[in-house]
Curated annotation (Swiss-Prot):
GO terms for molecular function: ATP binding; DNA binding; DNA topoisomerase type II (double strand cut, ATP-hydrolyzing) activity; metal ion binding. Keywords: ATP-binding, Cytoplasm, DNA-binding, Isomerase, Magnesium, Metal-binding, Nucleotide-binding, Topoisomerase. It comes from Rickettsia prowazekii (strain Madrid E). It is found in: Cytoplasm. Mg(2+) 1 binds at residues 435, 508. It holds the Pfam family DNA_gyraseB_C. It catalyses: ATP-dependent breakage, passage and rejoining of double-stranded DNA. Binds two Mg(2+) per subunit. The magnesium ions form salt bridges with both the protein and the DNA. Can also accept other divalent metal cations, such as Mn(2+) or Ca(2+). NCBIfam families: gyrB, PRK05644.1, PRK14939.1. Few gyrases are as efficient as E.coli at forming negative supercoils. Not all organisms have 2 type II topoisomerases; in organisms with a single type II topoisomerase this enzyme also has to decatenate newly replicated chromosomes. Residues 429-543 form the Toprim domain. Its cofactor is Mg(2+); Mn(2+); Ca(2+). This is DNA gyrase subunit B. Belongs to the type II topoisomerase GyrB family.
Length: 807
């Protein structure tokens, strides 16, 4: 018998465990109070987390080790676990099943008396009943007592009482499927990456619990499994995977018997210059910290002070250290389990339980100091880093003092390169950061000088990910930027003095421009994160193309926009003749072309792994699958290759021959006396990209199995493949127009720059947001740090996804 089964047998979790405090209507009237923002997506995803948290609470109690979240094709979500199953008996007070009570009463559950659950994700009027109230419909399945139970709700109202639908079932657990209310949420489309991040977090925090995430919404079924036995130590290593740790992880696990508070802690110092501390209470992240974070910081400072005094190392230090110095380069995950946690708000972003502080501070101080004493070599390396941080802080202080003295003597504190705006109100003022004097000059001429300031940055911008704070302050470009913004950095940072509430990075659409943008984003993320949090940082989106037709001009953002323009400009004068009779025109033709565009994109993706032309001709003949290995497919295969050999624009023109083997097919391409071999493995046809393109080709199979003739403005073209159809329409669309591609902002004149990028009524801006801090931390460390291997792996993993590379 497993531990899970034993726990189930011991359980006293029944209908009597469910306590009720009533009402659901308030949830529908003010959903934001219970589930979070219903407009920005946070509340929508919190619906999933509320259900998942119930499963995790079962895991914390020792009754569950498997949780699955499935995003369904119809837009609903299913969350299932192998816990005890929600109680199904009739509730004595309510006269209905306990399951129905839990789903329809706001304050109902087994977490009030701390008998069924000693630890849970806290209690503030949220729960699965809120999910039910804010769903168009919800279905609940329970496996308990060797039976399967079912109940369905519409807008939180029970359709019919809980019923038994199957018996003699050897299974335990709960499954909730819900469809979010369209009337409540602005957008009901779930984001896979957001959910993935939270589930990974939960898997790290609950060692030994397997969490599956399945996305069935698209043809490509995506499945991710999270299972970690290393707990939060593995979490720290995951977060810091792109950095050099200077010692092995320090791990603390302790339980305070009197209060019932337990503490899990994993930390190490790395060679970076930034602290990264993640705090959790009962598996819920506190972005604003709280009593556990304050206790941790205090304990670490005490540990360093005590160790320096004990070892006599304090006599060798040049400068006194601060608490910030002790935490430079620290990476830590701090997780506490508290029986009755108290938070500052409904969102649980800050823990205010005062009883947590002494427990955490004493445990961290005792255990970490003990580790220092047992590992003197590693401890000295940590102390050396802290002393180096103190020295750098002192150097930075002197640099700031020097800057202040210079500024006091100057008539104007603003840098000479800055072309400032006339407005003094930050709320309407904009700062454009541009690369080089050339683009800066054009921008100065084209701007609205009332509200728009231009700051050209010339020369190499410092990578602050690899530089200490004092070196950063010595950088001309960074110094110019800080002065122009009107605010300082680090502890002196204050948004009150910020001179512009729109700070816009405007760089060229080439490799150099992308690099400069990445360097600036790194600076803002590391040293002015509040600028991002307040929504003040933006990225300009200058157009890539200008299309001129007669006297009219149009600017297009990217390659996709240009393609759409060329198709739309041609479609009204175009029709497709099928087998010399049927005509495809108007919306039907447009629908086909949209499918061909998607098919073309799939071909581009697959072409990184196998020849594009061969893939296309096989796919539209239903041969880009295992049917190609069947003997009866040989004639169709040869016919398909004959078509490919006869395509005038095909790069594989001349002669293409084929040789079948049991587990592979060889394609021989003869051209200009040279022979090139392309091999298609049988196992390759099972790859998702290959299966996807094979299945999608079926949607256009009927059309391309016919003899096709395209008529564009009375001119006829024979069509054999989807690519040929798309390319013909695009080429026809280019006739009579002029297309200009901009590689840099300097290629535009001031009027063009105003019209496309500066004019607030026409431009497109991307607002910079950080959805998940630890994921952003990993990306900046990987791409901008000095550890090569994670960056190499990142490039390898994502290289095939690059469609347009400007070299």
């Amino acid at each position: 018998m497993s531990v899970i089964e034993e726990k189930c047998n011991e359980s006293s979790y029944s209908a009597d465990s469910i306590k009720v405090l009533k009402g659901l209507e308030a949830v529908r009237k003010r959903p934001g109070m219970y589930i979070g923002d219903v407009g920005d997506g946070s509340g929508l995803h919190h619906m999933i987390y509320e259900v998942v948290d119930n499963s995790i609470d079962e895991a914390l109690a020792g009754y569950c080790d498997l949780v699955q979240v499935t995003l369904n094709k119809n837009g609903s979500v299913t969350v299932s676990d192998n816990g005890r199953g929600i109680p199904v008996e009739i509730h004595e007070e309510e006269g209905i099943s306990a399951a129905e009570v839990i789903m329809t009463q706001l304050h109902a559950g087994g977490k009030f008396d701390q008998q069924s659950y000693k630890i849970s994700g806290g209690l503030h009027g949220v729960g699965v009943s809120v999910v039910n109230a804010l769903s168009e419909w919800l279905e609940l399945r329970i496996w308990r007592n060797n039976k399967e139970y079912f109940i369905r709700f519409n807008n939180g109202i029970t359709e019919a009482p809980l019923s038994i639908v199957k018996e003699n079932i050897d299974k335990k657990g709960t499954e909730v499927t819900f469809f979010p209310s369209v009337g409540t949420f602005t957008n009901i489309e779930f984001d896979f990456v957001t959910i993935e991040h939270r589930l990974r977090e939960l898997a790290f925090l609950n060692s030994g619990v397997k969490i599956l995430l399945v996305d069935n919404r698209f043809e490509e079924v995506k499945k991710v499994e999270f299972y970690y036995t290393g707990g939060i130590e593995a979490y720290v290593q995951y977060i810091d995977r792109a950095k050099h740790a200077i010692h092995p992880c320090i791990v603390v696990n302790t339980v305070h018997v009197e209060s019932g508070i337990s503490l899990e802690l994993a930390l190490h110092w790395n060679d970076s210059y930034h602290e990264n501390i993640l705090c959790f209470t009962n598996n819920i992240r506190q972005r604003d910290g709280g009593t556990h974070l304050s206790a941790f910081k205090s304990a670490i400072t005490r540990v360093i002070t005590s160790y320096l005094d004990t070892t006599g190392l304090n006599k060798k230090t040049k400068h006194d250290f601060s608490g910030e110095d002790t935490r430079e380069g620290i990476c830590c995950v701090l997780s506490v389990k508290v029986p009755d946690p108290k938070f500052s708000s409904q969102t649980k972003d800050k823990l205010v339980s005062s009883e947590v502080r002494p427990v955490v501070e004493n445990a961290v101080y005792t255990k970490v100091l003990e580790w220092f004493e047992e590992h003197p070599t590693e401890a000295k390396a940590i102390i050396a880093k802290i002393m180096e941080a103190a020295n750098a802080r002192e150097a930075a202080r002197k640099a700031r003092e020097l800057t202040r003295r210079k500024s006091a003597l100057e008539v104007s504190n603003l840098p000479g390169k800055l072309a400032d705006c006339h407005a003094k109100d930050p709320a309407i003022s904009e700062l454009f950061i541009v690369e080089g004097d050339s683009a800066g000059g054009t921008a100065k001429q084209g701007r609205d000088s009332k509200i728009q300031a231009i700051l050209p940055l010339r020369g190499k911008i410092l990578n602050v990910e690899r530089a200490r704070f004092d070196k950063m302050l010595g950088s001309d470009q960074i110094g110019t930027l800080i002065t122009a913004l009107g605010i300082s950095v680090e502890r002196e940072f204050s948004l009150e003095k910020l001179r512009y509430h729109k700070v816009i990075i405007m760089t060229d659409a080439d490799v150099d421009g992308s690099h400069i943008r990445a360097l600036l984003l790194t600076f803002f993320y590391r040293h002015m994160p509040e600028l991002i949090n307040k929504g003040y940082l933006y990225i300009a989106q200058p157009p890539l193309y200008k299309v001129k037709s007669g006297a009219s001009e149009l600017y297009l953002k990217n390659e996709k926009a240009l393609q759409n323009y060329l198709i739309k400009s041609t479609i009204n004068d175009t029709y497709l003749i099928l087998d010399g009779q049927e005509q495809l025109v108007g919306e039907n033709l447009e629908d086909l072309i949209n499918k061909v565009v998607k098919f073309n994109n799939l071909l581009d993706h697959v072409s990184k792994k196998f020849n594009r032309s061969i893939t296309e001709i096989l796919a539209i003949n239903d041969l880009f699958n295992k049917k190609i290995f069947e003997p009866e497919s040989s004639a169709r295969l040869q016919k398909a290759l004959d078509i490919l050999n006869n395509l005038e624009e095909s790069p594989d023109k001349t002669n293409l021959q084929v040789l079948k083997h049991e587990n592979k097919i060889e394609f021989f391409h003869f051209s200009r006396g040279l022979k090139e071999t392309k091999i298609l493995l049988k196992e390759q046809l099972e790859l998702f990209e290959f299966v996807e393109i094979s299945q999608f080709a079926l949607s256009i199979f009927d059309i391309f199995s016919k003899r096709l003739k395209l008529i564009v403005k009375s001119k006829a073209f024979d069509i054999l493949t989807p690519s040929q159809l798309l390319n013909t329409i695009i080429e026809c669309g280019k006739k009579g127009i002029t297309i200009q591609r901009f590689k840099g902002l300097g290629e535009m004149n001031s009027d063009q720059l105003w019209e496309t990028t500066l004019d607030p009524t026409k431009r497109t801006l991307l607002q910079v947001r950080v959805a998940e801090v630890d994921e952003a931390e990993g990306i900046f460390s990987t791409l901008m740090g000095d550890v090569v291997e994670p960056r190499r792996l990142f490039i390898q993993a994502n290289a095939l996804n690059v469609m347009n590379l400007d070299v």
